[in-house]
Every structure is written in C-alpha cells, then in structure tokens.
A protein has these predicted regions:
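Short, hydrophobic/glycine-enriched beta-strand segments
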Residues: 9-16
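Short acidic-hydrophobic, aromatic-tinged amphipathic segments that line or gate anion-handling sites
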Residues: 93-98, 164-176
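Acidic/glycine-enriched connector segments
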Residues: 5-7, 19, 27-35, 50-118, ...
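C-terminal amphipathic helix plus adjacent low-complexity
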Residues: 182-198
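A short beta-strand-loop structural module common to alpha/beta enzyme folds
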Residues: 43-49
C-alpha cells in the first residue's frame, strides 16, 4: 500500500493583521518564523492578510518557500478594494468568499498544524477551531499577551488535560517548529493506524 503521509506539511500561521499592540520585535519574529517554516520543509498557509501573517509570508518567500493564502473575499478585486488586503508574498491565493469567519474555518481545516503568534479576536477564533479539531498547535511566546490569554482560556475551560499532548509553547521559532513537526508526525501516524483498524 502506498504511504499517504505527505512529505511537506502545511503550517497555518495565525496572528494579528494589526500589530501595533504586539511590541517592537513582532515583525522580525514573524519573519523568522516564516524562514523556519521553509527550513523545516513545510508550506505556509495563512489568511492572505497584513500584519503577523504577512511578515511570516515575507520570511517564507525570502527563504524560497511556498505560501498559500486564504482570502475572506470572493475574488481578487474584493480582496484588494473592499478588504484592503495585499497579494504580494503569496504563491496562490484561494478566494473563499466566506468573509473572515468562514475563511478562518477553511484556513485552519486545510492545515496540518496551527501556529499562534501575537493576535486579536480573529486569532483566538482560529485557535479555537484548531483546538476543537484536535490539530497540533504551537503557541509562539513573546512580548505580546496572546500566549497568556490562550493559557488562561484553556485553564478556565477546564479542558487542559485534552490538549496537553497537542499544544506546545515556545519563544524560539526554530524550537517551536521542531516540537510542532514532532506533533504532526505523531498525529499522522495515529490517524494512519486508526484508518487501518477502522
């Protein structure tokens, strides 16, 4: 039987489109995260937006990697004129036509894992989708508060036991990717084993 584990994982980077409250280092950290995604032989999947995901996409392209953007718009004109979103640093943009909440669902579901950087409400939405879908999740710690908010959400939801083996926290993008790739590979092996027993 042919091995179905795809050699290039799709890593979603979720983060704030507006980064003013994220601290001075946020853009450099996002760009380095993008570079590390390529160094880990992965593809970046992101919301075809500005801010944290944009700088991650920039890092991916500087390292010669692939970026797939998922837009809330139904087409390029709406993407640029209505949503005021960029098209550069993306190899492919998929126009979902489902606004932000629908885009977030498709974007997250299309990924093998999700990395959460500095974010706002949309980032929390993408995190909760990944959480409920039992995706491997990497929380990038930094001078922002998103990582602390997510820890508090998990604690207050009394669901920490469910995710202790699926969420990793790390401030170094390289180490975060190392840990996240391990989770993806474990997740893929578990799914493959389950499909043989079904």
């Amino acid at each position: 039987m042919e091995d179905t584990i795809h050699p290039r994982y799709k890593i979603c980077v979720s983060g704030a489109a507006e980064t003013d409250s994220c601290g001075e280092s946020v853009l450099a950290v996002a760009e380095e995260l993008g570079r590390e995604i390529v160094r880990h032989n992965a593809v970046l999947v992101e919301g075809a937006t500005t801010g944290f995901p944009y700088w991650a996409a920039k890092g991916v392209k500087k390292e010669g990697g692939i970026v797939i953007g998922f837009s809330p718009a139904a087409g390029e004109k709406e993407h640029v004129e209505f949503y005021k979103l960029p098209t550069d640093y993306r190899d492919v943009i998929i126009y979902t036509g489902f606004a932000y909440s629908g885009r977030n669902l498709i974007l997250t579901r299309a990924s093998d894992a999700v990395i959460v950087g500095c974010g706002r409400m949309g980032t929390i939405n993408e995190f909760t989708i990944a959480f409920e879908d039992k995706k491997p999740i990497g929380i990038l710690e930094g001078e922002w508060e998103t990582d602390e908010i997510i820890k508090l959400l998990i604690e207050k939801s009394h669901r920490g036991d469910e995710v202790k083996d699926r969420i990793v926290y790390e401030s170094d993008p390289k180490i975060l990717l190392d840990k996240l790739i391990e989770l993806i590979e474990k997740d893929k092996k578990n799914h493959k084993a389950m499909s043989f027993h079904a």
